[in-house]
């Protein structure tokens, strides 16, 4: 099977890490162009040193390059506002181009590979939610495939050092997009997301807490589903792990809790604690929040490339 050529828009932390992953390991993708807006950026400099074509003129620069004619898939690691413009420009120039959105813009459907990649592999634009979403939504989905979930709340704690300008500029979009994806992909009736930028030195790894309120069900079945889901995520994010055993608490009918926007609740509370260690391809190991985004986007692009090859009649 021939490799599908890809471009990355955004030469910051996420874009650069993604480029290195593709260059080092990928079997189905060929890194063709790195796109930025700062000619002095480290990402563009690294791309040039690694033999990748570059432009510092943004999406317009990409479309003016001869390499653009052969690009099948574009990763966008800019910002939510920029992605809307990038999608419109690329779609006008090449209607069938595939975009993998690593911003909270969410023009296309949310994609969490271990939960719903197969049903979205032929979409022209997919959104990778957020780092917190990629880490925690699989856990919500693991519960919701066993029992009805009324409410899910996630707290994503990431090292402040790992949060670049793009992350900081999109905090509101982070919470909104993640909350919505907890419902749409995770299967919760109501979702809530909180992000914490941890200033600790030395920087700590990404930690995530997931609280799920559901109807009562077999705790063994729920725990087994969660463990199975965690193993599935580890297939493309090796540093993803449960920090401790799943904890349960039964909330009795005569002592319900009040959930804003939901009302009174009684049933089962499931608590999951996660840790995500980065692969340290470009970023430090503590930046698991960025690694899970690039790894999830890469897993999505690989499936897209295989789907495109099948449609073209190529052997896998």
UniProtKB/Swiss-Prot annotation:
It catalyses: acetaldehyde + NAD(+) + CoA = acetyl-CoA + NADH + H(+). The active site is at residue 131. Its EC number is 1.2.1.10. Gene3D superfamilies: Dihydrodipicolinate Reductase, domain 2, NAD(P)-binding Rossmann-like Domain. Keywords: Aromatic hydrocarbons catabolism, NAD, Oxidoreductase. InterPro entries: Acetaldehyde_dehydrogenase (IPR003361), Acetylaldehyde_DH_C (IPR015426), NAD(P)-bd_dom_sf (IPR036291), Semialdehyde_DH_NAD-bd (IPR000534). GO terms for biological process: 3-phenylpropionate catabolic process. It comes from the Bacteria. NAD(+) binds at residues 11-14, 162-170, 289. It is an enzyme of class 1 (oxidoreductase). Pathway: Aromatic compound metabolism; 3-phenylpropanoate degradation. One of its GO terms (molecular function) is acetaldehyde dehydrogenase (acetylating) activity. Belongs to the acetaldehyde dehydrogenase family. Interacts with MhpE. Catalyzes the conversion of acetaldehyde to acetyl-CoA, using NAD(+) and coenzyme A. Is the final enzyme in the meta-cleavage pathway for the degradation of aromatic compounds. This is Acetaldehyde dehydrogenase. It comes from Escherichia coli O157:H7.
């Amino acid at each position: 099977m021939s490799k599908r050529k890809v471009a990355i828009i955004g030469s910051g932390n996420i874009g650069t890490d993604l480029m290195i992953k593709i260059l080092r390991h990928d079997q189905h993708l060929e890194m063709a162009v790195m796109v930025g807006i700062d000619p002095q950026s480290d990402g563009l400099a690294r791309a040039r040193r690694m033999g990748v074509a570059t432009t510092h003129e943004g999406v317009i620069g990409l479309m003016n390059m001869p390499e653009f004619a052969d690009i099948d898939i574009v990763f966008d690691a800019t910002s939510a506002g920029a992605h809307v413009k990038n999608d419109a420009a690329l779609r006008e120039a090449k209607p069938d181009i595939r975009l993998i959105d690593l911003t909270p813009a969410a023009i296309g459907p949310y994609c969490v590979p271990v939960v719903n990649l197969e049903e979205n592999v032929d979409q022209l634009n997919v959104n990778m939610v957020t780092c917190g979403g990629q880490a925690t939504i699989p856990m919500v989905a693991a519960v919701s495939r066993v029992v009805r979930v009324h409410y899910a709340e996630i707290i994503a704690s990431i090292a402040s050092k790992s949060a670049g300008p793009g992350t900081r500029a999109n905090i509101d979009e982070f919470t909104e997009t993640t909350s919505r994806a907890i419902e749409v992909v995770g299967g919760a009736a109501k979702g809530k997301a909180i992000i914490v930028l941890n200033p600790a030195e030395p920087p700590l790894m990404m930690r995530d807490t997931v609280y799920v309120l559901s109807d009562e069900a077999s705790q063994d079945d729920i725990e087994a589903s969660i463990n199975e889901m965690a193993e599935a995520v580890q297939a493309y994010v090796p540093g993803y792990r449960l920090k401790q055993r799943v904890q349960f608490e039964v909330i009795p009918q005569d002592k319900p809790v009040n959930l804003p926007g939901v009302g009174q609740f009684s049933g089962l509370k499931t608590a999951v604690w996660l840790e995500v260690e980065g692969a340290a391809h470009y970023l430090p190991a503590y930046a698991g929040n960025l690694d899970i985004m690039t790894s999830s986007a890469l897993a999505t692009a690989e499936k897209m490339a295989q789907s495109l090859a099948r449609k073209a009649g190529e052997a896998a």
